[in-house]
Amino acid sequence: MIIRQARSTEIRTLAALGVIAWEQAFAAAGEVTNHLREKAEATYFGFCEQYWPIIIAAEIDGETVGWAALEPGQNKITDVWVLPNFQRHGIGTALLSELEQQAVSREFDEVFLETHAKNTPALSFFKKHEYTISGLKSAYSPTMDKSVDTLEMRKRFN
């Protein structure tokens, strides 16, 4: 596995990967509809098109299988996505570790993120990596096209 900077030539691939992983995460909660899928596709493409220089990608045998991003100049993790068939193989852990190293190199003493309160696999993943819940909020989500409950999670570095 290689963790590397994303390339401008793979914006569509990154966006599609994000949508596939998003669908898998929310299908179990009955949250995915064709309308939401279209909104998710537009949201992910827009994000990847604008922010590809800050995205890191995980590659296995020449295939991009995951990506993640840390907000520029901040300590907020915006995304961690891994294709469903490649989950539970250490890819998310490698991406998360790289983002944490970036935050430390920027002299931050912690990182934080927000995740959908019903995204049980994500909550378990981040708890496993020593993230703790630090807040709950309800806000409009462009991807979900409604107000959703999100949990803020933090990890402090010693």
Regions found by a protein language model. Give the residues of each.
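Extreme N-terminal starter segment of soluble prokaryotic enzymes
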Residues: M1-I3
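Acetyl-CoA-dependent GNAT
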Residues: Q5-N85, L96-E98, Q102, A139, ...
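Short Asp/Glu-rich motifs
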Residues: T33, R37, A122, D145-K146
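Conserved glycine-rich acetyl-CoA-binding loop
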Residues: E63, D79, L83-S97, V104-R106, ...
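C-terminal "cap" of GNAT-fold acetyltransferases
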Residues: D109-F112, H116-T120, K127-T132, L136-N158
